[in-house]
């Protein structure tokens, strides 16, 4: 069953300006080590960061909190499964909120899609509760 849904659309130029103005202060505040390594190695660095930023916004909406109530930027991280499909890992406040949303006997499956078409980056997050024995 779907227990959370969120989406976000961001202007890549906004993220690019934040990177130019604040540099590592911005990237270290908002992104995990894995996200920074992935984005810093990309030709379109700002677009890569913007997609991950949008994913975090979408995820916070799917959690029903936004970036409040103990949910912080680095509590949500975009990672890729072995086949390359993106998903999210939630820790700390975001992980606690996710656990509180799950019905007894269920585990979370987070679906994520991210895309960009300059000047925009977009993300959709669906949080699904799946039976542990099913």
Curated annotation (Swiss-Prot):
Q: Name one GO cellular component term.
A: cytoplasm
Q: What cofactor is this protein dependent on?
A: Mg(2+)
GO annotation, biological process: fatty acid biosynthetic process
Annotated Mg(2+) binding sites? 8, 57
Substrates-to-products reaction catalysed: apo-[ACP] + CoA = holo-[ACP] + adenosine 3',5'-bisphosphate + H(+)
Q: What is its EC number?
A: 2.7.8.7
Supply the alphabetized keyword list: Cytoplasm, Fatty acid biosynthesis, Fatty acid metabolism, Lipid biosynthesis, Lipid metabolism, Magnesium, Metal-binding, Transferase
Query: Which segment of the chain is annotated as a signal peptide?
Result: none
**Which Gene3D superfamilies does this one have?**
4'-phosphopantetheinyl transferase domain (3.90.470.20)
Cellular localisation: Cytoplasm
Give the UniProt family note: Belongs to the P-Pant transferase superfamily. AcpS family.
* Function field: Transfers the 4'-phosphopantetheine moiety from coenzyme A to a Ser of acyl-carrier-protein.
Q: Report the protein name in the record.
A: Holo-[acyl-carrier-protein] synthase
Q: Which organism is it from?
A: Agrobacterium fabrum (strain C58 / ATCC 33970) (Agrobacterium tumefaciens (strain C58))
């Amino acid at each position: 069953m779907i227990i959370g849904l969120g989406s976000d659309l961001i202007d890549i130029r906004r993220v690019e300006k934040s990177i130019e103005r604040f540099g590592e202060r911005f990237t270290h505040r908002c992104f995990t080590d894995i996200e920074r390594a992935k984005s810093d190695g990309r030709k379109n660095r700002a677009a890569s960061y913007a997609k991950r930023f949008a994913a975090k916004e979408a995820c916070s909406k799917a959690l029903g909190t936004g970036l409040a109530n103990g949910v912080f930027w680095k509590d949500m991280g975009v990672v890729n499964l072995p086949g390359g499909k993106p998903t999210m890992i939630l820790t700390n406040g975001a992980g606690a909120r996710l656990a509180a949303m799950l019905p007894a006997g269920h585990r979370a499956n987070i679906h994520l899609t991210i895309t960009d078409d300059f000047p925009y980056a977009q993300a959709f997050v669906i949080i699904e509760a799946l039976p542990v024995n099913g």
